[in-house]
From Swiss-Prot:
Name of this protein: ADP-ribose 1''-phosphate phosphatase
Reaction(s) this enzyme catalyzes, per UniProt: ADP-alpha-D-ribose 1''-phosphate + H2O = ADP-D-ribose + phosphate
Protein purpose: Highly specific phosphatase involved in the metabolism of ADP-ribose 1''-phosphate (Appr1p) which is produced as a consequence of tRNA splicing.
Keyword annotations of the record: Hydrolase, Protein phosphatase
Family: Belongs to the POA1 family.
Biological process, per Gene Ontology: peptidyl-glutamate ADP-deribosylation
Gene Ontology molecular function: ADP-ribosyl-[dinitrogen reductase] hydrolase activity; phosphoprotein phosphatase activity
Residues binding substrate, per UniProt: 9-11, 25-27, 32-37, 147-153
Record-linked CDD domains: Macro_Poa1p-like
PANTHER family: ADP-RIBOSE GLYCOHYDROLASE OARD1 (PTHR12521:SF0), PROTEIN C6ORF130 (PTHR12521)
Segments traversing the membrane: none
Top-level taxon in the UniProt lineage: Eukaryota
SUPFAM superfamilies associated with the record: Macro domain-like
Phylogenetic lineage: Eukaryota, Fungi, Dikarya, Ascomycota, Saccharomycotina
Source organism per UniProt: Meyerozyma guilliermondii (strain ATCC 6260 / CBS 566 / DSM 6381 / JCM 1539 / NBRC 10279 / NRRL Y-324)
């Protein structure tokens, strides 16, 4: 079972001696135009470019990305890496096909979050074999805001319940 730690502060100020994993919920349409995604775009522009390319590759069936996570190593030149010993990884969790009025239902978003976390866990297990990623007591650490609770409008308690099922430590940043 996952442990969730709530941290009052800015997700983007999180630092670790190893590479940090910064996760957020994404749409499958290649848009980080609002909410925390817009901040990710500003802090880690190299990852935004790769995210857009990834979505374009799946443009014929964007919903095929649902329930997956695209884990992207950022570049040292990204503003979000200022002051970091190792560059951050951005985990794009595809929880809704679209956004705005076309976003998926809350139930679908929660189900896709569960699948995205499973995908992320398997990627982190492999990555930890070759890269120094943030861990606590041998458990991989993921840092995130209250995903899905903003523009996707999913009650946090529903996402929280799913996150608690997973085998990672999650630092949830709240303002």
């Amino acid at each position: 079972m996952s442990k969730l730690n709530y941290i009052k502060g800015d997700l983007f100020s999180h630092k670790s001696s190893a590479s940090s994993i910064l996760a957020h919920a994404c749409n499958c349409r290649g848009s980080w135009g609002a909410g925390v995604a817009a901040i990710f775009k500003k802090q880690f522009p190299s990852t935004y470019k790769l995210y857009v390319e990834h979505c374009k590759k799946h443009a014929s069936n964007p919903s095929g990305l649902l329930g997956s996570t695209y884990l992207i190593k950022s570049e040292s030149s990204d503003p979000g890496n200022s002051g970091r010993e190792n560059v951050a990884y951005v985990a794009c969790m595809f929880t809704s096909d679209a956004f705005g009025r076309r976003k998926n239902s809350a139930d679908d978003i929660v189900e896709n979050t569960d699948k995205s976390m499973l995908h992320l866990e398997s990627q982190l297990a492999e990555l930890a074999k070759t890269e120094p990623i943030e861990q606590q007591d041998g458990v991989n650490v993921v840092n995130m805001p209250k995903i899905n609770a903003g523009l996707f409008n999913v009650p946090w308690e529903e996402t929280e319940a799913v996150l608690k099922k997973h085998q990672v430590l999650i630092n949830v940043y709240v303002i």
